[in-house]
């Protein structure tokens, strides 16, 4: 319930400032060059403001940096060595920005949006996975996520094993536009919406509440030409809860529609 309330507040924060503007009722459906956006625009002599329903998308791969094995995982490192090693080729990241508020003056563009982000992290050793387990020595009933070998649980044919997290966030960007070229830098604040662990053959999926940080902050930069571009994103906050690891994420990929 708290997540829902925070989400609604965040979305309102992104959209409500536009309600204070007197927009011209000018809806336009752009060509592919405008990435099929719907734009509502208000102009004055100095600043142009608009709301865009443009659906820019992000596709990339993510690696873990500054990996540590803290209290909850330190005892398992010898039994499951380097179990946080991930296969970057399969760490797929996808994001879609559903709506954004823009303010432009000359070549400078400020934007505030709402974005869904989906992150998959695939274990390099496909026999490794994580599962909830009752925490030992806890003063009250609680669970923690611990590593284990899938092969020890029954028949397993070595298919990929992964952990998954999805976020709803508010990205803020400062962009400089030069004709069809755009250079931008920004930050984002994101809330964790869902998380689970998954592997195939035998097919298995289980929620892993409490593994990932509930809040994620990131910095981002990118370059695009005619709406096709490259981006890099770094997670300032650790991906996991502090009791597990101080690992951060570094994501690189391509963008469409920025």
Listing of model-derived features with the role each one plays in the protein:
Residues 1-47:
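Cleavable N-terminal export/targeting peptides
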Residues 59-67, 116-122, 189-195, 227, ...:
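Transmembrane beta-strands of outer-membrane beta-barrel pores
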């Amino acid at each position: 319930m708290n997540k829902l309330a925070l989400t609604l507040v965040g979305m309102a924060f992104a959209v409500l400032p536009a309600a204070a503007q007197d927009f011209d009722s000018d809806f336009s459906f752009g060509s592919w060059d405008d990435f099929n956006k719907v734009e509502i625009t208000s102009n004055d002599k100095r600043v142009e403001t608009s709301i865009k329903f443009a659906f820019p998308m992000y596709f990339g791969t993510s690696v873990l940096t500054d990996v540590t094995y803290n209290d909850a995982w330190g005892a398992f490192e010898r039994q499951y060595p380097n179990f946080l090693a991930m296969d970057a080729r399969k760490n797929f990241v996808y994001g879609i920005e559903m709506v954004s508020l823009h303010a432009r003056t000359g070549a400078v563009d400020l934007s505030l949006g709402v974005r869904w982000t989906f992150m998959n992290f695939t274990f390099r050793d496909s026999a490794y996975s994580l599962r909830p387990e009752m925490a030992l020595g806890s003063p009250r009933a609680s669970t923690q996520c611990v590593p284990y070998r899938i092969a020890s649980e029954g028949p397993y044919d070595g298919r990929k094993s992964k952990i998954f997290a999805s976020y709803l966030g508010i990205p803020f960007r400062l962009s400089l536009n030069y004709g069809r070229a755009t250079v931008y830098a920004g930050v984002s604040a994101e809330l964790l919406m869902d998380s689970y662990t998954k592997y195939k053959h035998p097919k298995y999926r289980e929620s892993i509440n409490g593994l990932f940080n509930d809040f994620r902050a990131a910095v981002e930069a990118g370059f695009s030409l005619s709406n096709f571009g490259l981006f890099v994103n770094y997670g300032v906050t650790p991906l996991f809860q502090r009791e597990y690891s101080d690992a951060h994420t570094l994501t690189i990929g391509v963008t469409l529609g920025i």
